[in-house]
UniProtKB/Swiss-Prot annotation:
Signal peptide: none
Keyword Cell division among record annotations: yes
Function: Cell division inhibitor that blocks the formation of polar Z ring septums. Rapidly oscillates between the poles of the cell to destabilize FtsZ filaments that have formed before they mature into polar Z rings. Prevents FtsZ polymerization.
Alphabetized NCBIfam families for the sequence: minC (TIGR01222)
Family per similarity comment: Belongs to the MinC family.
InterPro entries: CAP/MinC_C, MinC, MinC_C_sf, MinC_N, Septum_form_inhib_MinC_C
UniProt-listed Gene3D superfamilies: 2.160.20.70, 3.30.70.260
Summary of subunit composition and partner proteins: Interacts with MinD and FtsZ.
Keywords, sorted A to Z: Cell cycle, Cell division, Septation
GO biological processes: cell morphogenesis; division septum assembly; regulation of cell division; regulation of cell septum assembly
Lineage summary: Bacteria, Pseudomonadati, Pseudomonadota, Gammaproteobacteria, Enterobacterales
Protein species of origin: Pectobacterium atrosepticum (strain SCRI 1043 / ATCC BAA-672) (Erwinia carotovora subsp. atroseptica)
Name of the protein this chain belongs to: Probable septum site-determining protein MinC
Amino acid sequence: MSQMPIELKGSSFTLSVVHLHDSQPEVIYQALQEKIEQAPAFLKNAPVVINVAALTAETDWIKLQQAISSTGLHVVGVSGCTDDALKKIIAQAGLPLLSEGKAQRRVVEPVAAVPAAVKTQIIDTPVRSGQQIYARNCDLIVTSNVSAGAEVIADGNIHIYGMMRGRALAGVSGDVQSQIFCTHLAAELVSIAGRYWLSDQVPEAYFGQPARINLNQLDNVLTIKPLD
């Protein structure tokens, strides 16, 4: 049998979500330009999802979309839209409306749980610019340096025993309890479960220092402290 011309498979990707808190195109354009200049390797020409939860139907979406696209970012979808009129405008612009699915409740009989071994992926070589390491369904340990322009990603925790100059994204499948441990922090970006800091948002006192980053469960923001 000849091979089918196409094949559909499920997959997952790490995308930045831009939350809009202003509807003025020129304000959004300037704010995005500043962010791109701070982390060009991460944001230049990047695909993004736009969250419009704070906007209303009075928003001139066409001009707003043009302002975002003119920065070089590629809008691949829109999330957080609850206004029916705004939904229609966005759909007419040819963009998909994204929403977080809610799992259906189901009743299962209790069974004796067998503790699963915690998996860990270990990288013993330097992670160079342009490389991406993804530890799916496990923690990631890097025993060497991570260069600027490199990306280390994990569904669990990330441990970096070297100079961290690239991007570290922990808990990418939504694990808000994931953490980042680093012996020499100089990252372009750190992220836990979608919440992230660019390099200029990391407290200066921790630059080049051993640090531990986690997500505060009370207010859902990143926090940092010395790595003892």
